[in-house]
């Protein structure tokens, strides 16, 4: 009788700008506080594609081969000796950012700001676009039976929306402007509505994406063409009948940030989620004299439990965001599809024995 084939650890590895390869890596052994995961679903993020195209994002530079992927879920294969809350067979969602030390930011509960944090697929740390991956067990969260692996993977972008809405103070009855109808704009829309926003208006250049935003719950949409930032602000006010209390900017485009400042109600909050140029010209005086608070967002913290509750209770529905699925073996084709701007969220299926959502 032939011996069973040894499982491989096919991994998607970026070696430098434009150099993306599928390679077989050793299956890692979990440490005492880690779990080994059989990966199931991993979403492609814009940052993954940026590392592939340019080999860097700001000061994060790919200096050695790095496995991509950080929007992920999988099944526990093996647990470390000190892990008590998980067991083999558990389905989990992975929070990609795990602090390495209990520094001042961790003590404040803002561990996302820790300069030494481990973060999947951020140099020099490997990600989880692979068959098998080990991770800090404290940052692996059990999925309820009614939450799919793909929903578990989408908790990562959903967490950005949760953190952004928290930073903006979105609450019952608010009018909210979301700039950008990409994946992050879409999850921000979903979270704002779930948190009680009375009306959410979404802006974008793409009529197709705005149609999707309308489909998943946007009250109003505004397609941008050649309007000035001031004109965009006036159109938003015209649609809502007032200025929004909260604007969440998800594009990073200079003109969109400018429009966000002009559009936000006096005393309101502008939250910057999208990453653009390091130096940006904005009408700060216009924000200052109207006490528009400008807040930054860097990833997220303390969001996975609430995201799981939102998904399990059906308070949000992220399933319509997935437009393409590829097996891990076709990862290069999947990345080319993303690069062409096709679809919204592309999901890679890492377990050859289970390609279901």
From Swiss-Prot:
Binding site for NAD(+): 184, 204, 209, 273-275, 297-299
The keyword S-adenosyl-L-methionine is assigned to this record: no
GO BP of this protein: D-glucuronate catabolic process to D-xylulose 5-phosphate; flagellated sperm motility; fructose biosynthetic process; glucose metabolic process; sorbitol catabolic process; xylitol catabolic process; xylitol metabolic process
N-terminal signal peptide: none
Entry's Gene Ontology cellular component terms: cytosol; extracellular exosome; extracellular space; membrane; mitochondrial membrane; motile cilium
Amino-acid positions noted as binding substrate in the UniProt annotation, renumbered to this chain: 51, 156, 299-300
Cofactor note: Binds 1 zinc ion per subunit.
Entry membrane topology: Peripheral membrane protein
CDD domains: sorbitol_DH
EC class: oxidoreductase
GO MF annotation terms: (R,R)-butanediol dehydrogenase activity; carbohydrate binding; D-sorbitol dehydrogenase (acceptor) activity; D-xylulose reductase activity; identical protein binding; L-iditol 2-dehydrogenase (NAD+) activity; NAD binding; ribitol 2-dehydrogenase (NAD+) activity
Modified positions (Phosphoserine) in chain numbering: 211, 225
Disease: Neuronopathy, distal hereditary motor, autosomal recessive 8: An autosomal recessive disorder characterized by motor axonal neuropathy, slowly progressive distal muscle weakness mainly affecting the lower limbs, difficulty walking, and increased serum sorbitol. Additional variable features are distal sensory impairment, upper limb tremor, scoliosis, and mild hearing loss.
The protein's name in its UniProt record: Sorbitol dehydrogenase
Species of origin: Homo sapiens (Human)
